[in-house]
Amino acid sequence: EAKDDLARLLRDYQDAMNVKLALDVEIATYRKLLEGEECRMSGECPSAVSISVVSSSSTTSASAGGFGGGYGGGVGVGGGARSGFGGGSGFGGGSGISGSSGFGGGSGSGFGGGSGFSGSSGFGGGSSGFGSGSGGRSGVSGGGLSSGSSRGGSVRFSQSSQRTSR
């Protein structure tokens, strides 16, 4: 009996950590897509931004501006509209995420305006940060995101050259 309970709790925990990492990736992807929109509108795009996701179960590499890939249990990351991401939620072109807060696509849109996310983390638009507390540690500042979880998953960004000054 106790062994079954422990196994179920471990599965639930691993599922929660997978969802947390997927949400971190989704947040980072949105941030990069929004930055790409802004630079495209202003006409001074930086060089290609790459996003790498490394976890104990799968690896997905992508570059901003239209990409698709599998991650974890059927999770897809995509720059285009109607791509799916985690547990049936979708993003791109103004769809909702995770059933609790909506995100708009297109230039100049942002996270937040007071909306909550994942129970323990909150967002503002622009360069403000957020923190999530489900056994991991993550932070967003400006254009970069670093994430760590007790499962050992991580999110890494690399940018091959600096943005030109305005």
From Swiss-Prot:
Organism: Bos taurus (Bovine)
Record protein name field: Keratin, type II cytoskeletal 68 kDa, component IB
Keywords carried by this UniProt record: Coiled coil, Intermediate filament, Keratin
Annotated Gly residues bias: 122-146
Cellular component, GO annotation: intermediate filament
Matching PANTHER family: GATA-TYPE DOMAIN-CONTAINING PROTEIN, KERATIN, TYPE II CYTOSKELETAL 3
Pfam family for this entry, one: Filament
Lineage: Eukaryota, Metazoa, Chordata, Craniata, Vertebrata
Subunit architecture: Heterotetramer of two type I and two type II keratins.
Region (Disordered): 122-166
Bias (Low complexity) ranges: 147-166
Keyword Ribosomal protein: no
InterPro entries for the chain: IF_conserved (IPR018039), IF_rod_dom (IPR039008)
Domain IF rod: 1-41
Family membership: Belongs to the intermediate filament family.
Region of interest called Tail, as start-end residue ranges on this chain: 42-166
Coil 2B as annotated region, ranges: 1-41
